[in-house]
Amino acid sequence: LKLGRRKRRRARERTADQISGGWDEFVDRVVDLGAPVPPRGTRRSGALAVEDHFAVVPGTGEMTESASGGAAIALADRADAEVFGPGDPSAEDVEAFWHDVDASATELASTQSKWRQLRARVSPRSLRRKERK
């Protein structure tokens, strides 16, 4: 199911929609890792929720610098610029964005235990989220 959703997002007709799909993919991956990203709101507010979630040291509740290092905010801002900016993003822009989505989500997953990573792969949390169109 998740792979099919990913393929549909990447295959959307408009490149701006493919960028939006990349952001949705990032959000779904971090939601499956346990990040409490609100289903409604701006990309930036979602990115801030991701940053906050990954800034908590597991098992201690202490705050530290986010494992994302600001990547979630950078992705959100970039998605907004590509989607709402003048003209449509190029195919190269889309490829670069999806590459960064995958790299950022993989980096965040690497901060979690192997057990948590496995649970995220099979988690239905992201499948229950309302898809943005």
Task: Describe every region a protein language model picked out.
Residues 9-13:
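Terminal, regulation- and interaction-focused segments at domain boundaries
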Residues 14-133:
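Membrane-proximal, non-transmembrane interaction modules
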